[in-house]
Amino acid sequence: MAKKGKKYVEAAKLVDRSKAYDVSEAVALVKKTNTAKFDATVEVAFRLGVDPRKNDQQIRGAVVLPNGTGKTQRVLVFAKGEKAKEAEAAGADFVGDTDYINKIQQGWFDFDVIVATPDMMGEVGKIGRVLGPKGLMPNPKTGTVTFEVEKAIGEIKAGKVEYRVDKAGNIHVPIGKVSFEDEKLVENFTTMYDTILKAKPAAAKGVYVKNVAVTSTMGPGVKVDSSTFNVK
């Protein structure tokens, strides 16, 4: 296990690991304990009472955060004809078909999200083994396989984030930057928490949300007491 730096150790002393904080207090503490010299990302981590090995307990989707993430997403769209023109007009960073598939096969990944029209998925599927492990494969559940390319691009540019439960039952999602006002981070957090609650699988038994924490890129995690705020 890597040894933590002196700044991290000092910052961690400010966090009571036995305590779950009010969400506003937790956000303020995450900003205070950030040790990065850059505008670090603030992330929320959920530990859920689900068994991801079972198909009926998979959790995956996307949501537009009210205040965005602070990161400009580079969007690659696989489309042809009028849909390609629509994508360009909507602000896609890259639009094409087989030409970009060839570039990706050669190791090009200067993008963050892929949107594909359904008729292009046969071609995109050819690079599924490359895209899948990187979390870049478009999927109908996240709204990235669609003929509504203008809407998809608009949502991504506005701050849409994807979430997916991992093998251990955890979900990690960015909710902004440490430079954000506290209120904006709290609002994004609440939206994300509400979304995860609504995504609860019917087959999930027992306690669903076991633990919630917020953290910055290079800072300590801060547990959140979810009972201290109102979820819609």
Curated annotation (Swiss-Prot):
PANTHER family recorded: 54S RIBOSOMAL PROTEIN L1, MITOCHONDRIAL (PTHR36427), LARGE RIBOSOMAL SUBUNIT PROTEIN UL1M (PTHR36427:SF3)
Keywords: Repressor, Ribonucleoprotein, Ribosomal protein, RNA-binding, rRNA-binding, Translation regulation, tRNA-binding
GO CC aspect terms: large ribosomal subunit
Domain of life: Bacteria
Keyword hit for Phosphoprotein: no
Function recorded in the entry: Binds directly to 23S rRNA. The L1 stalk is quite mobile in the ribosome, and is involved in E site tRNA release. Protein L1 is also a translational repressor protein, it controls the translation of the L11 operon by binding to its mRNA.
Protein name: Large ribosomal subunit protein uL1
Gene3D superfamilies in UniProt: 3.30.190.20, 3.40.50.790
Species: Bacillus subtilis (strain 168)
